[in-house]
């Protein structure tokens, strides 16, 4: 049998701020797929949503704090140095050129995956990476027709399949439901409410100390 490829997980997002709803599913994917490395990629200007409330350098700092004690995770800041929107397909092209024939696994939540046909050059994503879709057990809605066609062609039935080819598969990975949203955290911070245990303590402390997201300065 062929030796497994080096397998790198990629989790992009605004991380505005990063919280356990980002981190726990990614950790479960890391374990299930046996990722060699997990890269978190903060977006400078996301093309599909409103501009983040906090600047890119500050959000990247929070991500670094969130994974500082995780030897399997690191922060990839390449999108922060681009002018204009951060398109995932361009990031994957850069990574593929740098890393060669490793297995790249783009991690997406189920709701984000449903919107994939609205992304720039979305079919090219599968040429450059696998897509790992995190979902709650037993909860899967109808897929848009274009997406259903890709799933039928590309679905992987075992995580191990992703370690033996560099790109092209779609894996649905059940993860523990974590009902935390950045919107809810920002709202609580603006009202001066506690967000303890919703995000890593190092992240919470920095946000409170700096007064980001409108947290009251006492």
UniProtKB/Swiss-Prot annotation:
It is an enzyme of class 2 (transferase). CDD domains: NMNAT. It catalyses: nicotinate beta-D-ribonucleotide + ATP + H(+) = deamido-NAD(+) + diphosphate. Pathway: Cofactor biosynthesis; NAD(+) biosynthesis; deamido-NAD(+) from nicotinate D-ribonucleotide: step 1/1. Pfam families: CTP_transf_like. One of its GO terms (molecular function) is nicotinate-nucleotide adenylyltransferase activity. Keywords: ATP-binding, NAD, Nucleotide-binding, Nucleotidyltransferase, Pyridine nucleotide biosynthesis, Transferase. GO terms for biological process: NAD biosynthetic process. Its EC number is 2.7.7.18. NCBIfam families: cyt_tran_rel, nicotinate (nicotinamide) nucleotide adenylyltransferase, PRK00071.1-1. Catalyzes the reversible adenylation of nicotinate mononucleotide (NaMN) to nicotinic acid adenine dinucleotide (NaAD). Belongs to the NadD family. This is Probable nicotinate-nucleotide adenylyltransferase.
């Amino acid at each position: 049998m062929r030796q497994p490829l080096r397998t790198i997980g990629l989790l992009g997002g605004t991380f505005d701020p990063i919280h356990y709803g980002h981190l726990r599913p990614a950790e479960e994917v890391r374990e299930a797929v046996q990722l060699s490395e997990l890269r978190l990629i903060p977006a400078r200007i996301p093309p599909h949503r409103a501009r983040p409330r906090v600047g890119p350098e500050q959000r990247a700092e929070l991500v670094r704090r969130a994974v500082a004690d995780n030897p399997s995770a690191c922060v990839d800041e390449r999108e922060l140095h681009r002018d204009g929107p951060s398109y995932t397909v361009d990031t994957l092209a850069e990574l593929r050129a740098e890393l060669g024939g490793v297995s790249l696994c783009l991690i997406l939540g189920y709701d984000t995956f449903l919107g994939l046909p609205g992304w720039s050059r979305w079919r090219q994503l599968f040429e450059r990476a696998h897509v790992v879709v995190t979902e709650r057990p037993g909860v899967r809605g109808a897929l848009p027709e274009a997406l259903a066609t890709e799933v039928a062609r590309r679905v992987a039935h075992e995580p191990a399949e992703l370690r033996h080819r560099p790109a092209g598969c779609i894996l649905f990975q059940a993860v523990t439901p974590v009902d935390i949203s950045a919107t809810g955290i920002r709202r609580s911070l603006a009202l001066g409410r506690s967000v303890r245990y919703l995000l890593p303590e190092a992240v919470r402390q920095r946000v409170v100390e700096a007064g980001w997201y409108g947290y009251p300065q006492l």
